[in-house]
Amino acid sequence: MASSTKVSLRRPPRPQVMYSLKPKVVEFDKVWVQLRPSIIDIINLRPITNVQWHHKFSDVYDICVSIPTPLSERLYNEVKACIQEHVRQKRQDIVDVDPDLLLQEYHKMWRVFHEGAIFIHRLFGYLNKQFVKQKRCTDLDNFAQYAAFLQIPDVKEIGCLALEIWKEDLVKTILPQLVKLLLIAIDNDRKGNFPHIANEVSGVINSFVKMEETDFDVVPAEGARYKARESTTAFYQESFEKPLLTDTEQYYSALAQKMLTDLSCSEYMEQVIVLLEQEEMRAKKYLHESSVEKVITLCQKVMIKAHKDKLHAVCHDLITNEENKDLRNMYRLLKPIQAGLSVMVKEFEEYVKKKGLEAVSRLTGENVPQQFVENVLRVYNKFNDMKTAVFMDDGEFSSGLDKALQGVVNSKEPGQSVPKASERLARYTDGLLKKSTKGLSETDLEAKLDSAIVIFRYIEDKDIFQKFYSKMLANRLIASTSISMDAEELMINKLKQACGYEFTSKLSRMFTDIGLSQELSNNFDKHIADIKTVQPDVKFVPTQTMILQAGSWPLNAPQLSTNSNNQTAQDVANFHLPRILQPVIQEFEKFYTGKHNGRKLTWLFNMSQGDVRLTYLDKQYVAQMYVYQMAALLCFERRDAILVKDIGEEIGVSGDYLLKTIRTILDVTLLTCDDQNLTADSLVRLNMSMTSKRMKFRLQAPQVNKAVEKEQEAVANTVSQDRKYYMECAIVRIMKTRKVLKHNALVTEIMDQTKGRFSPDVPFIKKSIEDLIEKMYIQRTDQNDEYQYLA
């Protein structure tokens, strides 16, 4: 029997044309007597020769095309009766089998019958094509005989017919016994008593699907025999899947209750993960692929979803204690559950924010910006690693981490109206990009700039950062204290990637101005050289001039300030440029206006510096100082001692700024004064015995009042005004596009447009809308909370 089965499982050779295709008269009974035994042999997988196969194939063809009337329908009915008789015999055989051997015997019978049905289907291929398919088409032709068609029994192709008979006449009679034995086998597998008939269990279960195959004409790829055939799972689902799911739910519900009683939460989670993995492997081993997800979802429902409150109850402690292993297990279990992670995400977010606020509170010392950035980065790196390792970079936890750090970075200190993060980050980057004795490699510098961008993305008031950063960049560029122009450009490109071109457009123009200024200075030097060629006695102090666009640089000339509260502007309003600088300044103005007629130059003497060579001392020193300091020191060219007020009258500087200027010169001991407190009546002397370890040194800029606080106030005022203009422009752009818009919709679009620069509050938005209504850019409509654009 084994030998014959092995032979019959090979695909039979395709029939060759060995017979006449011409229709002829056929004696049905005579042909059928010879055909019927072959059907039984084939369906039992008994071997037949090629000649026999071709003869039987020819017999089927002859019957289907016989004259004067084709005998297809009679052949179909006889084949059906033959298969029914065969299946009834098999049913009797299986009924008599020992119950303990039922699965094995059924599986053996099924394998033979299923394979035999496939070959029978091929043998009767012409009958399927000529009778079955044509009958279906003609019965439905134009729906003319639709009512009659409803009374005709379903005509199936031979392969489908054989499986239908198997299902109806055999399987359904023993289905309860089969299902019971299958469930027992799976239950034993769950308990560790692995059945020795695993292949038979899987084969019987999948027979419930295969017996509903509908397409026997598909030729599967080699190594994937018959898997490509279409089938439905209705019978499988109703007869086996339903009882299986019921049994599974009962089993794991009871098991979950027992484990919760006997195990800790940590142990419970570990055990559930193991059970889920085992059940998934078991489902893939035994069940149809459509059942795998259903079984796992059901297990998750009874072991996780039903008890998620118990898991949530310990979540706070696990996160607070940073029990990463348990948290990873909890994440794996709750991830597939709808809204299962909400509590974990909330606890994670709150814990990160708590640790972050602790890290940035009570910062003291001179390096607060560096402490702030490094502490925030420490928190970010720690919990970003935790998010990756524990929560698999899950989007919900990424969002929670971002919200937490946004809350940390934008937190306000007591008594502060705006967060300090923007200023601190700007000062931190200023420290990185300034020349210093502690050099960084290009790789280290870029890594630190990348870290700064991480924090920058969390800052809500990006416009405040922009103001501070542009001021500090301007100082670096003017004073030539940048570590390198490549590093400056690298940072600007990173800001551009984070916020777009508009955010960095002014910063880029500052770079352009520096390049153009260098070219202009070179041309001016050539111009001076040409003058000296003609007039050798003319003396010009060597200079390097920067031409800076007023709209791009965050700089102001104090002498032109219209702010009545600006005391510095009043103190330097009548400043007299030193005579030694006047020729070159006048010549440069003449040179520049000759090339750029119509442009106006405003000198920023408060930012202008020069080198003064000191030749009256034992050694020749070079002091780098600001123009106001230079003017004051030059007063001592003809005198050794002068009253402070006389210096002020001579250089045109007065008030507190004059005192600050003199004090900076006293600080480096170029001048001396006997008075403890410097006043306008104090007498200052030139220090003829001054010494310094450095041959070249720099004087500090005069500090007017509290410079940092003044800078913060100036930035706050500028930002407030810029926000007002930006907000009004955004509203006008939106309304010009929309024409008519509801209040809430307008607020939403405003928030979306401004989020890249700052986060406006609702009162500020409302005030901006009211201002535009007064200016008649928009108006209210007759509808409630609706605005209309006015062209």
Swiss-Prot record:
Cellular component annotations (GO), alphabetically ordered: Cul2-RING ubiquitin ligase complex; cytoplasm; nucleus; SCF ubiquitin ligase complex
Annotated pathway: Protein modification; protein ubiquitination
Compartment(s) of residence: Cytoplasm; Nucleus
Tissue: In adults, highly expressed in meiotic cells and oocytes. In larvae, expressed in many proliferating cell types: P cells during the L1 stage; seam cells when they divide at every molt; vulval and somatic gonad cells in late L3 and L4 stages; and intestinal cells throughout larval development.
InterPro entries registered for this protein in UniProt: Cullin, Cullin_CS, Cullin_homology, Cullin_homology_sf, Cullin_N, Cullin_neddylation_domain, Cullin_repeat-like_dom_sf, WH-like_DNA-bd_sf
Position of the Glycyl lysine isopeptide (Lys-Gly) (interchain with G-Cter in NEDD8) cross-link: 736
Domain Cullin neddylation: 722-784
UniProt note: phenotype after gene disruption: RNAi-mediated knockdown prevents the release of sld-5 and psf-1 from chromatin prior to prophase in early embryos.
Alphabetical keyword list: Cell cycle, Cell division, Cytoplasm, Developmental protein, DNA condensation, Isopeptide bond, Mitosis, Nucleus, Ubl conjugation, Ubl conjugation pathway
Transmembrane segments: none
Gene Ontology terms: biological process: anaphase-promoting complex-dependent catabolic process; anterior/posterior axis specification, embryo; chromosome condensation; germ-line stem cell division; male germ-line sex determination; male sex determination; male somatic sex determination; meiotic spindle elongation
Keyword Ubl conjugation: yes
Signal sequence bounds: none
Keyword presence, Cytoplasm: yes
Superkingdom classification of source: Eukaryota
An example molecular function term from Gene Ontology annotations: ubiquitin protein ligase binding
PTM field: Neddylated; which enhances the ubiquitination activity of CBC (Cul2-ElonginB-ElonginC) E3 ubiquitin-protein ligase complexes.
SUPFAM superfamilies: Cullin homology domain, Cullin repeat-like, Winged helix' DNA-binding domain
Stated role: Core component of multiple cullin-RING-based CBC (Cul2-ElonginB-ElonginC) E3 ubiquitin-protein ligase complexes which mediate the ubiquitination and subsequent proteasomal degradation of target proteins. As a scaffold protein may contribute to catalysis through positioning of the substrate and the ubiquitin-conjugating enzyme. The functional specificity of the CBC complex depends on the variable substrate recognition component. May function in ubiquitin-mediated degradation of CKIs to target cki-1 for degradation.
Subunit structure: Component of multiple CBC (Cul2-ElonginB-ElonginC) E3 ubiquitin-protein ligase complexes formed of cul-2, elb-1, elc-1, rbx-1 and a variable substrate recognition component. Component of the CBC(fem-1) E3 ubiquitin-protein ligase complex with fem-1, fem-2 and fem-3. The CBC(fem-1) complex interacts with tra-1 and promotes tra-1 degradation. Probable component of the CBC(lrr-1) E3 ubiquitin-protein ligase complex incuding cul-2, elb-1, elc-1, rbx-1 and lrr-1.
The family this protein is said to belong to: Belongs to the cullin family.
Protein name: Cullin-2
Origin organism lineage: Eukaryota, Metazoa, Ecdysozoa, Nematoda, Chromadorea
Gene name of the record: cul-2
